[in-house]
């Protein structure tokens, strides 16, 4: 149901002449999980600034509504059974594919966009001009995101604290697919490797640190039992602060 809904949404925006995105490239057609979508362009680049300004409000509201429906549909479709073989399909940072995914997970992008709109809580025009890219804003910590395979991870820690082996391939009806994990971690080559950006170093010690969250993956425990388990992967780069003593 979720995959069908995704296909309808992508087709809908692909057919619109005055869409917020000029193009939507869908890659990873062999994947069983959510395809990646990259969007470019604005209304002004399609029909000119006047036409764009007239339709911007209604289209933005429509897009937000579609995002909310998509996220609600994903929540309803999450399986309740612990050992369901489809469990990984409902984790936005996990994908089964025959090749390396070329884009971030779709739900990952939609959740980021929805969170941004909720936080802004402004008119459409103000939202556009409050885009961090337009204001030259920078992140407190520099992070990098990439797809990694089970061959890269090999082992992981599950929710019980035990070490499990992450299986590289998952059997499906037509063969096998690889497990891919979309990980985010602090950039060791970034400008924030020696401290967080924008922090007053006279009063604070700061450090950018990679944090982890749980995702569903096909694994094997120490007793050779294979099953779907929650494992920890790198999911964000955050700033930690400690006050300097003696001040």
From Swiss-Prot:
Pfam families: NGF
Post-translational modification: Mature BDNF is produced by proteolytic removal of the propeptide, catalyzed by a FURIN family member. In addition, the precursor form is proteolytically cleaved within the propeptide, but this is not an obligatory intermediate for the production of mature BDNF. Can be converted into mature BDNF by plasmin (PLG).
GO cellular component, one term: perinuclear region of cytoplasm
Residue ranges annotated as propeptide in the record: 19-128
InterPro entries referenced in this protein's UniProt entry, alphabetically: Brain-der_neurotrophic_factor, Cystine-knot_cytokine, Nerve_growth_factor-like, Nerve_growth_factor-rel, Nerve_growth_factor_CS
PROSITE patterns named among the record's database cross-references: NGF_1 (PS00248), NGF_2 (PS50270)
Keywords: Cleavage on pair of basic residues, Disulfide bond, Glycoprotein, Growth factor, Secreted, Signal
Disulfide bond sites: 141-208, 186-237, 196-239
Residues of the signal peptide: 1-18
GO molecular function, one term: nerve growth factor receptor binding
Primary location: secreted
Site (Cleavage): 57-58
GO biological process: one example: negative regulation of neuron apoptotic process
Subcellular location as annotated: Secreted
Function: Important signaling molecule that activates signaling cascades downstream of NTRK2. During development, promotes the survival and differentiation of selected neuronal populations of the peripheral and central nervous systems. Participates in axonal growth, pathfinding and in the modulation of dendritic growth and morphology. Major regulator of synaptic transmission and plasticity at adult synapses in many regions of the CNS.
Family per similarity comment: Belongs to the NGF-beta family.
Summary of subunit composition and partner proteins: Monomers and homodimers. Binds to NTRK2/TRKB. Can form heterodimers with other neurotrophin family members, such as NTF3 and NTF4 (in vitro), but the physiological relevance of this is not clear. BDNF precursor form: interacts with the heterodimer formed by NGFR and SORCS2. Mature BDNF has much lower affinity for the heterodimer formed by NGFR and SORCS2.
UniProt-recorded name of the protein: Neurotrophic factor BDNF precursor form
Organism (species): Felis catus
Gene of this entry: BDNF
